[in-house]
């Protein structure tokens, strides 16, 4: 506990949250300009952002195996929580694929759009082919895609049904 009776873990959490908000507010305008001006480093800023987030939250990532080189990859992973995005986004230059509803979320929706997330309308079965073509175009352009097909997060103890 700190001297005023507040648990140190609470203070640490508040400090990390304030640092996270500062880090986010610092990089959002830079990324916004990079995306609007179609600058090549608009693909690099999200990696820097996610690595900074992991650092601020004290998260270390250990990688087993070798990354695929020379060809774009569609990564399909179970979604255990919001940190999955920071972890995956810190490891590879990528475009996330997310359900359309996320684009309307007040805070994370803005961050997702700035990272050039592809939003999929899972209810519109008539546009499945068009949405598939959009994903293929990203792969053809050499971009890695990251997809969490469950459509939600879980506790990570079991694989959920893909949607």
State where each predicted segment sits:
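A transmembrane-helix-recognition feature enriched in membrane-embedded lipid enzymes
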Residues: 2-62, 110-115
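Soluble catalytic domains of membrane acyltransferases
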Residues: 55-163
